Every structure is written in C-alpha cells, then in structure tokens.
C-alpha cells in the first residue's frame, strides 16, 4: 500500500485512513458533514496526491493526444487546462482526465488514481504509431494539493504574494516558486467552489500544506478527506469513474457531450459516438428522494407503473440541502426534471423525482 508525502500529517491529525486506489488516504478528520460545510462556507485543503500524473512529450505529442482523447486540444493555449475523456473503440470510457498544455510539445495529464496503471498502459499501447512521442509516469515523484472554497483564493494570495490570482482563471495554470522550488498552480477543482490545485515535488508538499494552513487559520480552513470530496462533487453532479461513467457508458449518455468534439479529426471511439448521437436510449440525471432513506449505487429505479427504468449511479444525504440526492442512469423518456420515480431501497420502494444538476449554487455559480 502506498502513502502520500502527507501521510504522517494525516495520521497525527487523527484522520480515519482507508485504502483508496492503492493508497492509504484520509477519508475524514472531524467528520464528513463538518468538512463539507467548511468547503462550502470557507476553505478546505485536500491531499489528492494519489491521482496519477503523466507527461507526454514530443513533436507529435498533441497529435497523439488528439487521437487518444475526445476534446479538442487545438482550443487549448499554452498555460491552459482542458477536461477530457479517453474512449475505447466501442465508445465506453477508459477514464476522464485533465490535460495541461505546457507548450506545443509538452502536456501534463492528471488521471484517476484507480485507473492510473490502466491509463498508462492504454496510452503506451497506442504511442508507437506517433514516432518520437514519449510517455512518462511521474505519479510517485509529485504531490497534488487542492485548496477549495469561497475564501481559497484569498489564502492562496497570502502564501504566493507575487501571484496574480485574478489572472489565473478557471482552467488556467502557471508555474511559480515556493521556497525556491517550482510548483504548478491550476484553477481547477472537484467541488464547484473557487479554488486551485497545486502540483509540486513530494519534498515540498508538507511545507506548502503547513503554509496554507497557517495562512488560512483565521479564515477557518480545514483539512478535508475523501468522504467530503465525494459529497461535494455529487452536489455538483460531477462524474466519478465507476459510478456515472465507466467502460460501458458512452459519454453522450453521461451528460458529457460537451467534451466530445465531433468536428475535430479522427479520435478513438468517434464512430461509436456518432452512432449514438441523435439516437440516445439512456442518460444520466440527478434525482432526490422523499424522506431520509439513502440511495446507493446499483439500487434500481422504477416508473409509477413499477417498471424498471434504470439504476442509481451515486447517492448521499446532501449536507447542503439536508435531503437524499443522487445521480441515476435512466431510460431517455424519464430524463426530464420533475419526472416522478421510485427507488428500491432495501426491498421497499420510495418516491422521488428527477432533478436538474447541479443541486446547489456555489461561489463559482
């Protein structure tokens, strides 16, 4: 089992540690609900160093990534990040990822922890056709810290006074020095709040973590575990691999058509997406349940005639709304917000309704 460079800090802080993606990671400190509210109201600090990260380099690096992913990197400038997908030929999703364009021949990729080895092998499997392109795995050398919340950028400015924080912007990134070491700061996140994700060498993770905590002390900054990270992303309707998206789900079914650029050249899985386009049979939507029962992944959904129409992708008790919410994969006719549904929970059917995503408004709304 791997440990991040911040593992000892989490342990000393009394975090509950679990195995996640082959890493020993903090799932909670004070409690998921308290941590969730801290991010929505002030600021939270996340250790997400378990995420996989790769460099793709070479004169044909962009050409290679254009073929391997669905979004259009011609729309990304140097210093810009782009949400993206890798597909199998049949249209199922290999993974979702963020690609950072450092320059025309250098790209940095952040992928899901549980898929890192699979993703690396998938990319490596297809790289030979693009002569001179090199794929490097830097996962074990780098740490990733997320600072998120309405007050996050104020805290960031305290630690990096020379950084032009307003100019950073969503899905923009820059490289700056921290105690003489170069770090990459990106206007990205997984919470729906203002914030950044900071990538840096392992040796500098603890000094930066402690500096951000010191700077955010008066603002109420809190350490945040993976439990609250999940409730925060679910309130926004963000996809999680293995839940809303997987190898059997086409991105057009998963509310991710905006990431699939049919107008660019050929890419892996394009034909499968073209076949589905205009002929969707299913889709992913939000829903809420009456009462206090918790919907969990794989629970079945029914229409008012008790015909099975889908399943739960993710579910939780929303700390913000104080009601059970989730995402579901349902037959197309039931995707409209306001449509009544039934969800089977431990053998009983509970009433609910399809909801528009996201469930909440945030500091970025």
UniProtKB/Swiss-Prot annotation:
It comes from the Bacteria. One of its GO terms (biological process) is glycine decarboxylation via glycine cleavage system. The keyword Transferase applies. It catalyses: N(6)-[(R)-S(8)-aminomethyldihydrolipoyl]-L-lysyl-[protein] + (6S)-5,6,7,8-tetrahydrofolate = N(6)-[(R)-dihydrolipoyl]-L-lysyl-[protein] + (6R)-5,10-methylene-5,6,7,8-tetrahydrofolate + NH4(+). Pfam families: GCV_T, GCV_T_C. InterPro entries: GCS_T, GCS_T_bac, GCST_C, GCV_T_N, GcvT/YgfZ/DmdA, GcvT/YgfZ_C, TrmE/GcvT_dom1. GO terms for cellular component: cytosol; glycine cleavage complex. SUPFAM superfamilies: Aminomethyltransferase beta-barrel domain, Folate-binding domain. Belongs to the GcvT family. This is Aminomethyltransferase. The gene is gcvT.
